[in-house]
UniProtKB/Swiss-Prot annotation:
Gene (name only): rsmA
Summary of the function given for this chain in its UniProt record: Specifically dimethylates two adjacent adenosines (A1518 and A1519) in the loop of a conserved hairpin near the 3'-end of 16S rRNA in the 30S particle. May play a critical role in biogenesis of 30S subunits.
Domain of life: Bacteria
SMART domains the UniProt entry points to: rADc
Name listed for the protein in its UniProt record: Ribosomal RNA small subunit methyltransferase A
Family matches, as PROSITE patterns: RRNA_A_DIMETH, SAM_RNA_A_N6_MT
Signal peptide residues on this chain, from the entry's feature table: none
PANTHER family: DIMETHYLADENOSINE TRANSFERASE, DIMETHYLADENOSINE TRANSFERASE-RELATED
Listed EC numbers: 2.1.1.182
Reactions the enzyme catalyzes: adenosine(1518)/adenosine(1519) in 16S rRNA + 4 S-adenosyl-L-methionine = N(6)-dimethyladenosine(1518)/N(6)-dimethyladenosine(1519) in 16S rRNA + 4 S-adenosyl-L-homocysteine + 4 H(+)
Subcellular location: Cytoplasm
Record InterPro entries: KsgA/Erm, rRNA_Ade_diMease-like_C, rRNA_Ade_Mease_Trfase_CS, rRNA_Ade_methylase_Trfase_N, rRNA_adenine_dimethylase, SAM-dependent_MTases_sf
GO function term, MF aspect, one: 16S rRNA (adenine(1518)-N(6)/adenine(1519)-N(6))-dimethyltransferase activity
Amino acid sequence: MNNRVHQGHLARKRFGQNFLNDQFVIDSIVSAINPQKGQAMVEIGPGLAALTEPVGERLDQLTVIELDRDLAARLQTHPFLGPKLTIYQQDAMTFNFGELAEKMGQPLHVFGNLPYNISTPLMFHLFSYTDAIADMHFMLQKEVVNRLVAGPNSKVYGRLSVMAQYYCNVIPVLEVPPSAFTPPPKVDSAVVRLVPHATMPHPVKDVRVLSRITTEAFNQRRKTIRNSLGNLFSVEVLTGMGIDPAMRAENISVAQYCQMANYLAENAPLQES
């Protein structure tokens, strides 16, 4: 039997499709999401409705974003979910979550078993809409969840860690083995909860500057910041901020990256593009 076929649908590699089929895992994820009637619930990549069905049972209305035309068509004719669903057959990577929140009149509760081949760029896309999002629950590659929650002085702490924690409180929820999926992925998975900060713990004047600094620092993570960020900050400026120029990118806290971003925004602001 072809282990890429589940419920009559052939999993498409180009969409990174792995379908969840373990009932205990499904129940645990739905319990973590805790869907309530009246909430603006949005699922990314519903696939064969493993999460859509138990979440939809608790709701009067559910919005789903599904790129695969065949899967979107299956959902439209779903025997009991069909009437509850608003289906957007499009790419979540270009979806305007801000417009949807405005249309629904409240912040969104976003969830999904995300395709692992786009999970990191999709997270960055979602971070740009955190003003329109109440919370997010995602199944991701375990390695990505480890990066999301990592703190300084860790090998997996990187740009994703800094930007995720700048925008959100990040909480690991559950680890999931490959056997919970059809076809089984070659990696372990995990569920993570991201709750956008109601009040930013480390506000920055221009998030583009924070993005630039973290990109430059972590692209050269083995270098000291005296070297990797030398084109942006003098040793004197770093020392004046209480930041040791001999540290590497992975040694610098989210608060310190935000401090550097604010210095640069004040003293060498980016031009409007």
